């Protein structure tokens, strides 16, 4: 599944293609969305934003298209009138005079009003977005120590979107390496210095991944172009201590770490 940085980079491309432009053609695959096709033609795309791994497309008539890529969804930008050859199922087409954005394979798609947006179950459940620049390490520190999070092992907590939105497996792996923490630890077990280091890493690593423009293709959403320290490097030497990086399964996901310096 693509993580927060990949979703935000995809959104950046969509923004460049259609925001501020008038829609000339709208098509939805799902019957419940069909009534909105005619309504949206002639409207402008005002904004495209992300909340964790969800993408929100705002229109000038105050409708908001909610979509979540889940495992297989992917957005593409094409020229107006273009229909790429693909085995994927097209779900959404939003076209302007010159460009079109296409959503393939996703199944979690809804049209919302501003009021419904504030009560949407997924958006209500998720925590602060790690790519929101107003989120500070001090706020993350406080969140780590909340009663519902402070005794949960990091192996599961860092995958829980209710804790911080936008984190995923490669970020979990790299954050814990950066903080020199083993995955079985909890916030309640850490000292002040460890909590501060982890709080910094929880924001620095996702933002580094986003800012260094990771590469994404249809089948591999994990390839950010910054130096992975442990992710997919099992059997190699840890650059920090020289120990051997290991791979295991935690919370049903592959986990990479250096047992020698992550304690």
From Swiss-Prot:
<protein>
    <recommendedName>
        <fullName>Endonuclease 8</fullName>
        <ecNumber>3.2.2.-</ecNumber>
        <ecNumber>4.2.99.18</ecNumber>
    </recommendedName>
</protein>
<dbReference type="InterPro" id="IPR015886">
    <property type="entry name" value="DNA_glyclase/AP_lyase_DNA-bd"/>
</dbReference>
<feature type="active site" description="Proton donor; for delta-elimination activity">
    <location>
        <position position="253"/>
    </location>
</feature>
<dbReference type="GO" id="GO:0006284">
    <property type="term" value="P:base-excision repair"/>
</dbReference>
<dbReference type="InterPro" id="IPR010979">
    <property type="entry name" value="Ribosomal_uS13-like_H2TH"/>
</dbReference>
<feature type="binding site">
    <location>
        <position position="169"/>
    </location>
    <ligand>
        <name>DNA</name>
    </ligand>
</feature>
<comment type="similarity">
    <text>Belongs to the FPG family.</text>
</comment>
<keyword id="KW-0238">DNA-binding</keyword>
<dbReference type="GO" id="GO:0008270">
    <property type="term" value="F:zinc ion binding"/>
</dbReference>
<keyword id="KW-0456">Lyase</keyword>
<feature type="active site" description="Proton donor">
    <location>
        <position position="3"/>
    </location>
</feature>
<dbReference type="Pfam" id="PF01149">
    <property type="entry name" value="Fapy_DNA_glyco"/>
</dbReference>
<feature type="binding site">
    <location>
        <position position="70"/>
    </location>
    <ligand>
        <name>DNA</name>
    </ligand>
</feature>
<feature type="zinc finger region" description="FPG-type">
    <location>
        <begin position="229"/>
        <end position="263"/>
    </location>
</feature>
<dbReference type="InterPro" id="IPR010663">
    <property type="entry name" value="Znf_FPG/IleRS"/>
</dbReference>
<dbReference type="GO" id="GO:0003684">
    <property type="term" value="F:damaged DNA binding"/>
</dbReference>
<dbReference type="Pfam" id="PF06831">
    <property type="entry name" value="H2TH"/>
</dbReference>
<feature type="binding site">
    <location>
        <position position="125"/>
    </location>
    <ligand>
        <name>DNA</name>
    </ligand>
</feature>
<keyword id="KW-0479">Metal-binding</keyword>
<dbReference type="GO" id="GO:0140078">
    <property type="term" value="F:class I DNA-(apurinic or apyrimidinic site) endonuclease activity"/>
</dbReference>
<comment type="function">
    <text>Involved in base excision repair of DNA damaged by oxidation or by mutagenic agents. Acts as a DNA glycosylase that recognizes and removes damaged bases. Has a preference for oxidized pyrimidines, such as thymine glycol, 5,6-dihydrouracil and 5,6-dihydrothymine. Has AP (apurinic/apyrimidinic) lyase activity and introduces nicks in the DNA strand. Cleaves the DNA backbone by beta-delta elimination to generate a single-strand break at the site of the removed base with both 3'- and 5'-phosphates.</text>
</comment>
<feature type="active site" description="Proton donor; for beta-elimination activity">
    <location>
        <position position="53"/>
    </location>
</feature>
<dbReference type="InterPro" id="IPR015887">
    <property type="entry name" value="DNA_glyclase_Znf_dom_DNA_BS"/>
</dbReference>
<keyword id="KW-0378">Hydrolase</keyword>
<dbReference type="Pfam" id="PF06827">
    <property type="entry name" value="zf-FPG_IleRS"/>
</dbReference>
<dbReference type="InterPro" id="IPR012319">
    <property type="entry name" value="FPG_cat"/>
</dbReference>
<keyword id="KW-0511">Multifunctional enzyme</keyword>
<keyword id="KW-0862">Zinc</keyword>
<feature type="active site" description="Schiff-base intermediate with DNA">
    <location>
        <position position="2"/>
    </location>
</feature>
<dbReference type="InterPro" id="IPR035937">
    <property type="entry name" value="MutM-like_N-ter"/>
</dbReference>
<dbReference type="InterPro" id="IPR023713">
    <property type="entry name" value="Endonuclease-VIII"/>
</dbReference>
<keyword id="KW-0326">Glycosidase</keyword>
<keyword id="KW-0863">Zinc-finger</keyword>
<keyword id="KW-0227">DNA damage</keyword>
<keyword id="KW-0234">DNA repair</keyword>
<dbReference type="InterPro" id="IPR000214">
    <property type="entry name" value="Znf_DNA_glyclase/AP_lyase"/>
</dbReference>
<dbReference type="GO" id="GO:0000703">
    <property type="term" value="F:oxidized pyrimidine nucleobase lesion DNA N-glycosylase activity"/>
</dbReference>
């Amino acid at each position: 599944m693509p993580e927060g940085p990949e979703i935000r980079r995809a959104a950046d491309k969509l923004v460049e293609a259609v925001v501020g432009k008038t829609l000339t053609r709208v098509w939805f695959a799902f019957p419940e969305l069909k009534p909105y096709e005619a309504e949206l033609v002639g409207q402008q795309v005002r904004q495209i934003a992300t909340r964790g791994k969800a993408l929100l497309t705002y229109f000038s008539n105050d409708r908001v298209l909610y979509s979540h890529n889940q495992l297989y969804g992917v957005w593409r930008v094409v020229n107006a009138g273009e229909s790429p050859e693909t085995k994927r199922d097209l779900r959404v087409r939003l076209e302007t005079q010159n460009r079109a954005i296409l959503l393939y394979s996703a199944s979690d798609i809804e049209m919302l009003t501003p009021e419904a947006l504030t009560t949407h179950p997924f958006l209500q459940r998720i925590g602060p977005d790690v790519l929101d620049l107003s989120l500070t390490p001090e706020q993350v520190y406080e969140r780590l120590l909340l009663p519902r999070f402070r005794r949960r092992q990091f192996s599961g907590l860092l995958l829980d979107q209710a804790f911080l939105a936008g984190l995923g497996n490669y970020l979990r792996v790299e954050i814990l390496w950066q903080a020199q923490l083993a995955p079985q630890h909890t916030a309640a077990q850490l000292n002040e210095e460890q909590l501060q280091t982890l709080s910094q890493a929880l924001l620095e690593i996702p933002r580094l991944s986003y800012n260094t423009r990771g590469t994404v293709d249809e089948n591999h959403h994990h390839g950010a172009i910054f130096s992975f320290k442990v992710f997919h490097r099992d059997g190699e030497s840890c650059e920090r201590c020289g120990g051997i990086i290991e791979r295991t399964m935690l919370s049903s996901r592959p986990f990479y770490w250096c047992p020698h310096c992550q304690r």
